[in-house]
């Protein structure tokens, strides 16, 4: 009996300890929740120690911080941005103005025959009045509104263009190429003839019966000539 009484008395402090622990936990939880902001839309932020906050700010997604910013092209795609030198401007490269030619050009080519006339003319309007200069294969060949080739020669076959300059700007004409007609073609060089060797003292030689006949005929002819001369001299003396 004494043992049972002693054991019952020893259980009371354990239950009291559990009750006290539960009361302390509930009071701590209520006090923590009461301190949170109650306004609508407010962000709940828990306090973070200074050292931990520094570590998070420096080590959070390091690969994103090391990556350089991506530049975008005009179409919004990632890549190297374009510059003014890469994008041609139509105002800096105006369309070429065609020339007025005689004979008429076909796809930038004038077909003509040698020793015929070729006329090139460029009618351009600029303010102030421009100075027109012509070039032949990149070399200056004349000035003025017209370029007149009186007799076309092989040396004048090539590309011509005109440049107009004034104090404000410079314009370039459409280049034209002067070429021979397809039917005429380039001037042909005569084929070399075969040369036969010849001896320094080579002459027409006669031998045999033909040589004897030639000598006899020459002798008879000489005698007839001398006889006729003597005959006419005698007749003159008799008179």
UniProtKB/Swiss-Prot annotation:
It is a single-pass membrane protein. It comes from Mus musculus (Mouse). The keyword Membrane applies. May be involved in osteoclast differentiation. Its main location: membrane. The keyword Transport does not apply. The chain crosses the membrane at residues 214-234. It is found in: Cell membrane. Keywords: Cell membrane, Immunoglobulin domain, Membrane, Transmembrane, Transmembrane helix. Residues 63-93 are annotated as: Disordered. Residues 94-179 form the Ig-like domain. This is Immunoglobulin superfamily member 23. GO terms for cellular component: plasma membrane.
């Amino acid at each position: 009996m004494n043992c049972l009484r002693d054991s019952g008395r020893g259980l009371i402090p354990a239950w009291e300890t559990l009750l006290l622990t539960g009361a302390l936990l509930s009071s701590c939880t209520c006090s923590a929740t009461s301190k949170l902001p109650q306004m609508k839309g407010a962000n709940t932020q828990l306090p973070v120690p200074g050292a931990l906050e520094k570590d998070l700010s420096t080590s959070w997604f390091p690969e994103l911080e090391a990556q350089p910013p991506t530049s975008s092209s005009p179409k919004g795609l990632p890549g190297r941005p374009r510059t003014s030198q890469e994008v041609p401007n139509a105002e800096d490269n105006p369309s070429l103005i065609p020339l007025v030619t005689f004979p008429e050009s076909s796809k930038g080519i004038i077909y003509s025959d040698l020793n015929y006339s070729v006329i090139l003319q460029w009618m351009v309007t600029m303010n102030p009045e421009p100075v027109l200069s012509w070039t032949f294969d990149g070399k200056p060949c004349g000035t003025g509104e017209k370029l007149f080739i009186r007799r076309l020669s092989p040396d004048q076959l090539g590309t011509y263009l005109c440049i107009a300059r004034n104090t404000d700007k410079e314009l370039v004409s459409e280049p034209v190429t002067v070429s021979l007609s397809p039917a005429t073609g380039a001037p042909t060089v005569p084929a070399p003839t075969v040369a036969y060797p010849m001896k320094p003292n080579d002459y027409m030689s006669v031998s045999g019966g033909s040589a004897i006949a030639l000598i006899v005929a020459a002798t008879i002819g000489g005698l007839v000539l001398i006889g006729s001369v003597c005959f006419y001299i005698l007749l003159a003396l008799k008179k």
